[in-house]
């Protein structure tokens, strides 16, 4: 068997798929804008946007951006709440962890009192 040139990727092909199975593959691109790039259902986000009487039209790109922003927001507050749970030597998030995260992070000040 011939030696693989450095950087050619041939050596990785000979190694088999052992290392490839653990590596997450990005989703295949599709023709629909925002398809598979958002974990929230875009139809549901669009329905929520249309529920606002002040909104008359919302483009697909705007719906996608709102869905992505909501995902990032939920991810951020969940991580902060999980840190609060870890401080209490727990792995399960509880309501008090969300309350503590809201109190601890200035960016979440607008949420104070919403869980009451």
Curated annotation (Swiss-Prot):
Residues 1-10 have a biased composition (Low complexity). It comes from Bos taurus. One of its GO terms (cellular component) is epsilon DNA polymerase complex. GO terms for molecular function: DNA binding; protein heterodimerization activity. Component of the DNA polymerase epsilon complex consisting of four subunits: the catalytic subunit POLE and the accessory subunits POLE2, POLE3 and POLE4. Interaction with POLE3 is a prerequisite for further binding with POLE and POLE2. GO terms for biological process: DNA-templated DNA replication. The keyword DNA-binding applies. Keywords: DNA-binding, Nucleus. Residues 1-36 are annotated as: Disordered. Accessory component of the DNA polymerase epsilon complex. Participates in DNA repair and in chromosomal DNA replication. This is DNA polymerase epsilon subunit 4. Its main location: nucleus. It is found in: Nucleus. It holds the Pfam family CBFD_NFYB_HMF.
């Amino acid at each position: 068997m011939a030696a693989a040139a450095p950087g050619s990727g041939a050596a990785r092909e000979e190694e088999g798929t052992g290392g490839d199975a653990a590596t997450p593959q990005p989703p295949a691109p599709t023709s629909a804008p925002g398809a598979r790039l958002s974990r929230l259902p875009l139809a549901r986000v669009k329905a929520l946007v249309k529920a606002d009487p002040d909104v008359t039209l919302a483009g697909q790109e705007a719906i996608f951006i709102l869905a992505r922003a909501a995902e990032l927001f939920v991810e951020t507050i969940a991580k902060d709440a999980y840190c609060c749970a870890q401080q209490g030597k727990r792995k399960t998030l509880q309501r008090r962890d969300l309350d503590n995260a809201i109190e601890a992070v200035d960016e979440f000040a607008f949420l104070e009192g919403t869980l009451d």
